[in-house]
Amino acid sequence: MLVLGIESSCDDTAAAVWDDGTVRSNVVSSQADLHEEYGGVVPELASRNHQRLIVPVVQRALAEADADARALDAIAGTYGPGLPGSLLVGLSFAKALAQGLDVPLIGVNHLEGHVYSVDLGPERPARPFLCLIVSGGHTELVHVGDDFQHDVLGRTRDDAAGEAFDKMAQLFGLGYPGGPDIDRHAESGAPTFHDFPRSRLDDFDFSFSGLKTSVLYYLRDRSDADRERLLDEHLDDLCASVRAAVVDVLVDAVRRAVEATGVGHVAVVGGVAANSALRRRMKALGDDEGVDVSVPDLAYCMDNAAMIAQAGARRLAAGHASPPTLDVHPSLQL
């Protein structure tokens, strides 16, 4: 089954070809440099650039897969959640291509794509498993059963983990996206430099707004000279301290969920799953709790179309297809 996946939910334009269990191509065109000067994604700029990039990205994905579009069995496209304008570009292209080739259209939930991205690697988790989705826009803990059976145990009540990293990086004078910059600096810093707050809720929900506010006040309540000296001399330590605060909260929630459910396999997916400390801590959690932990390769942590193509193929095999009237759902949930 040859499936073309298209992903454009935020600021990455992506296309990939999935062929019966194999990723034949996975092309991603990032707009990070374009949005860096604004400190975050500008929706209008993102959608405009998706329009410019969608055709060459799809052409490249087909070329790298050595695949003829006429041989495709289906087109899978992200229809939510995400930025409305960005979603429209990718889904409209997917709908037109499916209609032109007379093949099924499969609408894919971006979050479902992340959940099953763990199956793109060698460590495919047994079902059921717990899945921690951590990205710029979402932080959710999900119990995953058989295909398409998802039970959300908890989600963020305010900022997502990736969003918190971006905002704290901005306070530190770092670039966008901020998560990778914080992670890089943190590797050389002392996580015990400052004890920033950890919000541990009674259920499995998350909250990172308190941490973000604490960092803001920690810097704001200093003279300009003192703040400049602090950021100059202890940037690595500050990054390590905030990274530790975020990772502690995430790992603690997963540990409690493992104990509450008895599930023996955990997956960590999404852009923040690329965070080196989170990957190490989750592996350590697996050793401590006697559970298997799966984390996708870095290429599949970030937004990509391979996960969309694979999820689409999975739905097509189950007899699911979307009508040509499928519309975008920016606030779609699992």
Swiss-Prot record:
Substrate binds at I133, V134, S135, G136, G137, D166, G179, D183, N275. It is found in: Cytoplasm. Its EC number is 2.3.1.234. GO terms for biological process: tRNA threonylcarbamoyladenosine modification. Gene3D superfamilies: 3.30.420.40. Keywords: Acyltransferase, Cytoplasm, Iron, Metal-binding, Transferase, tRNA processing. Transmembrane segments: none annotated. Fe cation binds at H110, H114, D303. Pfam families: TsaD. It catalyses: L-threonylcarbamoyladenylate + adenosine(37) in tRNA = N(6)-L-threonylcarbamoyladenosine(37) in tRNA + AMP + H(+). NCBIfam families: gcp_kae1, T6A_TsaD_YgjD. Belongs to the KAE1 / TsaD family. This is tRNA N6-adenosine threonylcarbamoyltransferase.
